Amino acid sequence: MSSAATKATFCIQNGPSFEGISFGANKSVAGETVFTTSLVGYPESMTDPSYRGQILVFTQPLIGNYGVPSGEARDEYNLLKYFESPHIHVVGIVVAEYAYQYSHWTAVESLAQWCQREGVAAITGVDTRELVQYLREQGSSLGRITLADHDPVPYVNPMKTNLVAQVTTKKPFHVSALPGKAKANVALIDCGVKENIIRCLVKRGANVTVFPYDYRIQDVASEFDGIFLSNGPGNPELCQATISNVRELLNNPVYDCIPIFGICLGHQLLALASGASTHKLKYGNRAHNIPAMDLTTGQCHITSQNHGYAVDPETLPKDQWKPYFVNLNDKSNEGMIHLQRPIFSTQFHPEAKGGPLDTAILFDKFFDNIEKYQLQSQAKSSISLKVTYSTDKSRLQSINVTKLAKERVLF
């Protein structure tokens, strides 16, 4: 540690404050304070768009010991190899002890260097056990990190902002399955999608066309074999455009048989579009080891989770939906499944990276539904590269998806 280390303070609004040392960007920040008990995967967590606007507390006592891998490395699908999106989405991180010395064969820089380059505040030396105990008892709280030579910034509640609009792709983009492996065309509504979700789709043979969160999917659904609703940040009730579009899709009898799969925020938006309600959890569920029971089989699965809101299962229309999974820790809803149609969703992340892969089979279930839909539609075996989409939401035009961007469009 440098002898010129900058002192910093982490404060909870109307709560405790903690002294520490800054190892991130030279800035003070504010946001909603949440914690994760995940032992590994801090690069994936920090680049997960679901953490947008939040200060993330790590309960793992030593953070940064394996450095940070390349944010430029891509896999055979042209997806980011190590990150869940191109940039960090948390505004700050809080750790008990930062590992100034790091070692890993994939590392290209330290966690401190990465935070400084990305403009993310970071503080070490905080009693995270005491802090997390407070958050568990009082609930997720507004917090701020203030550097010693800075004036405190005002507390900010990001849950009052439509965070999805900040993280969604700005234009459609397309990710293809490997040559000769394509089985289906899937439309993905990007509310803050993680790279590994797209990977789980394309590696199973999907040509994935990703649309902005407010895109009128109901206008183009007939061009696809399945619809996917992604994860994302913030209060689901602020995504009214998505809710309205999904509701219109659900209410159109033309699409009665089209498969739909939602994860995390996508699960909540699907529930809201169906007439159910959501509520904010006291401190949320953010970990890689949360047990969820499949109510259709009685089996328990260990799941990866990152959410601060949940669906109220009692408000689901009982003639259409039933709960699919339940959290065995706090009994909150973890999924729902349609009684007549090939539609289901989960609150947890079956694509987990990092985390357990117990429920990755749900992607296979989605593709089983797609195969049945294709047979019902007498789909041809060849996969068309033609899709129809609206560039101005009022005029439809047919284009070749090979002309779309091949990665998310940030600006």
Swiss-Prot record:
GO terms for cellular component: carbamoyl-phosphate synthase complex; cytoplasm; cytoplasmic stress granule. It comes from the Eukaryota. It is found in: Cytoplasm. It catalyses: hydrogencarbonate + L-glutamine + 2 ATP + H2O = carbamoyl phosphate + L-glutamate + 2 ADP + phosphate + 2 H(+). It is an enzyme of class 6 (ligase). One of its GO terms (biological process) is L-arginine biosynthetic process. Its EC number is 6.3.5.5. The keyword Hydrolase does not apply. It holds the Pfam family CPSase_sm_chain. Optimum pH is 8.0. The keyword Cell wall biogenesis/degradation does not apply. PROSITE patterns: GATASE_TYPE_1 (PS51273). The active site is at 264 (nucleophile), 349, 351. Gene3D superfamilies: 3.40.50.880, Carbamoyl-phosphate synthase small subunit, N-terminal domain. Pathway: Amino-acid biosynthesis; L-arginine biosynthesis; carbamoyl phosphate from bicarbonate: step 1/1. L-glutamine binds at residues 50, 232, 234, 265, 268, 306, 308-309. Small subunit of the arginine-specific carbamoyl phosphate synthase (CPSase). CPSase catalyzes the formation of carbamoyl phosphate from the ammonia moiety of glutamine, carbonate, and phosphate donated by ATP, constituting the first step of 2 biosynthetic pathways, one leading to arginine and/or urea and the other to pyrimidine nucleotides. The small subunit (glutamine amidotransferase) binds and cleaves glutamine to supply the large subunit with the substrate ammonia. PANTHER family: CARBAMOYL-PHOSPHATE SYNTHASE ARGININE-SPECIFIC SMALL CHAIN, CARBAMOYLTRANSFERASE FAMILY MEMBER. Heterodimer composed of 2 chains; the small (or glutamine) chain promotes the hydrolysis of glutamine to ammonia, which is used by the large (or ammonia) chain to synthesize carbamoyl phosphate. In S.cerevisiae, this enzyme is synthesized by two pathway-specific (arginine and pyrimidine) genes under separate control. One is linked to the arginine pathway and is designated CPSase A (CPA1-CPA2), it is repressed by arginine. A second one, CPSase P, is part of a multifunctional protein (URA3) encoding 3 enzymatic activities of the pyrimidine pathway (GATase, CPSase, and ATCase); it is feedback inhibited and repressed by pyrimidines. Present with 2580 molecules/cell in log phase SD medium. This is Carbamoyl phosphate synthase arginine-specific small chain. It comes from Saccharomyces cerevisiae (strain ATCC 204508 / S288c).
